[in-house]
Amino acid sequence: VMSAGNGNLSFYYCYEEGIAEKISTVPFSHSIVMPEYVVLLSADCENAVILQSDAVSYFKEQFFTVLQASLPLLNTVDTASLLSVFIQLSSETSRSYMLELQPCLTAFVDEEIIQNVINKSLPAAQQQLLTATLLRQCSNLKRISDFISVFSKRGLDDFVEKGIVYQVPLELYQPPCLQDRIKMLQRLIDANETGAKKFYMIKDTHFHPVFEIFTYNSSVLFSLTDSLASDASICILKENTIIDSFQAFLRHAVSHDLTYSIEETTSIFKEAVSRLKAQCDNI
């Protein structure tokens, strides 16, 4: 769905499947509503019909009906709100394949870790809300049985060396202490070794993800976070072909040597734990 006015162009995505299916069955499924006439286009854009001004009001009404079932195709949200988007999409899914800048660390926090890192200068109500949000997201992710995360080395290094968690705005927390980082990494190791989750680190020589992709049973989320982890540009689609394509891409990356194997990735996690334990011993 596209709307243009006053020199501005906006794109919307129709989330109401029934409306989309109804439109797709019409021979001329695309329409352009102008002030004085309406242009109807066939699905392949090879044929067109021009309707005169008496059709404008009818097609405007149809357009706004579709628009009411639509949301902006691209949206910018603060990172704290992005956690709520993740919760909404992951709450009823049994499958999640992810291309991430960092392994999915929010799946391995607990209330003790959250209380250790949360910014104590935040209002008490905000601290409680953030704690509840993170715990709910952790619960959702733990429940997902078919779970694959393909992530970058840079993101893992930032967590191990600096305690940075990309999915949480920097002003909301302080870096986890060495012991808490070890605890979270150990949970990553346990997930890989038991098969509860599957984490694969991307080989640096192959590709570097710039944005993140999160696929679920019936939706896919594209996310690009700014350098301060304060805002994210997001796009949510609910097209089965797109979901299937990106899940197939991630399976291809895993099976065609673009990533380290589960065993190799687990060894990398263990090496990181050893480095952190050595730092603890030197304190």
What is each stretch, according to the model?
Residues 1-252, 258:
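Hydrophobic protein-protein interaction segments
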